[in-house]
C-alpha cells in the first residue's frame, strides 16, 4: 500500500466529480513523478478561484464581478432569457454561438427524491427578472431527463400568466442526458428548432 500522505491525496482527489479511485491514483502519481509540475501554481489557482469567483447577482452564472460578462455585455439580446440548470450549461450553449440573449441559472432541478423543490432553486429571482416587462421570450434549456422536464413544466406553468413567450429546446437531445455532454451541432440545432409552449 501507499504511505499515509499519498493515500490522503488519492482520497481527496477522489472527492472531485468524475474522478474515481483509479483516476485519483493516476493524478497523484503524476504529481509525485513529475517534479517540473508546478503544484504551487495549481494550489494558488485553486485558492484564487475559491476567493474570487462568485455567482452573478443578475443571472446566477459564475463571475469575478457582481455582474457576469454576459449580463454586462450590451450586445446581448435583453428580451430573451435562456433558463438553464447549472453554469456548465451556459458554457455548452455559448459554444454553439446560436444564442445571443441572456441566461438565468437555476442552481439545479426540481427533484422530490433528492428533496429539491422549487423554493430551493433560483426561480423566485427569475420571476423578479421577468416582472419588469422587458423580457419577451424565455427559452427553457433544462436537461432532457425527468428532473429537467419537471422543472421546465413547472416554470412554464408559473410564467403562463405573464404573457411571455415560452419555448424549450427542440428534440434531438438524448433523453436522460445532460446538456453539458451534447455536441455543439446538436445543441445548436435544438436551439434553432426550439418549440413554443404557449
Swiss-Prot record:
Recorded superkingdom: Bacteria
Keywords: DNA damage, DNA recombination, DNA repair, Metal-binding, Zinc, Zinc-finger
Nucleus among keywords: no
One Gene Ontology term of the molecular function aspect: DNA binding
InterPro entries: DNA_Rcmb_RecR, Rcmb_RecR, Rcmb_RecR_Znf, TOPRIM_dom, TOPRIM_RecR
Start and end residues, zinc fingers (C4-type): 56-71
GO annotation, biological process: DNA recombination; DNA repair
Every Toprim domain range: 79-174
CDD domains linked: TOPRIM_recR
UniProt cross-references to HAMAP family, sorted A to Z: RecR (MF_00017)
Purpose of the protein: May play a role in DNA repair. It seems to be involved in an RecBC-independent recombinational process of DNA repair. It may act with RecF and RecO.
Record-stated family: Belongs to the RecR family.
Name of the molecule in the record: Recombination protein RecR
Organism in which the protein naturally occurs: Tropheryma whipplei (strain TW08/27)
Lineage: Bacteria, Bacillati, Actinomycetota, Actinomycetes, Micrococcales
Amino acid at each position: 500500500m501507499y504511505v499515509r500522505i499519498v493515500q490522503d491525496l488519492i482520497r481527496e482527489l477522489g472527492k472531485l466529480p468524475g474522478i474515481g479511485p483509479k483516476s485519483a491514483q493516476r493524478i497523484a502519481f503524476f504529481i509525485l513523478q513529475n517534479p517540473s509540475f508546478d503544484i504551487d501554481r495549481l494550489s494558488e489557482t485553486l485558492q484564487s478561484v475559491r476567493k474570487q469567483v462568485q455567482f452573478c447577482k443578475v443571472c446566477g452564472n459564475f463571475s469575478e464581478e457582481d455582474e457576469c460578462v454576459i449580463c454586462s455585455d450590451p450586445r446581448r439580446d435583453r428580451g430573451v432569457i435562456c433558463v438553464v440548470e447549472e453554469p456548465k450549461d451556459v458554457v455548452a450553449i455559448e459554444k454553439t454561438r446560436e444564442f445571443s440573449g441572456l441566461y438565468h441559472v437555476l442552481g439545479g432541478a426540481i427533484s422530490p427524491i433528492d428533496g429539491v423543490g422549487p423554493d430551493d432553486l433560483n426561480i423566485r429571482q427569475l420571476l423578479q427578472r421577468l416582472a419588469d416587462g422587458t423580457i419577451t421570450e424565455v427559452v427553457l434549456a433544462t436537461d432532457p431527463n425527468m428532473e429537467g422536464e419537471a422543472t421546465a413544466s413547472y416554470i412554464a406553468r408559473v410564467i403562463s400568466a405573464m404573457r411571455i413567450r415560452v419555448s424549450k429546446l427542440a428534440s434531438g437531445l438524448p433523453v436522460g442526458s445532460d446538456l453539458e455532454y451534447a455536441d455543439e451541432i446538436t445543441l445548436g440545432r435544438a436551439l434553432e428548432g426550439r418549440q413554443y409552449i404557449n
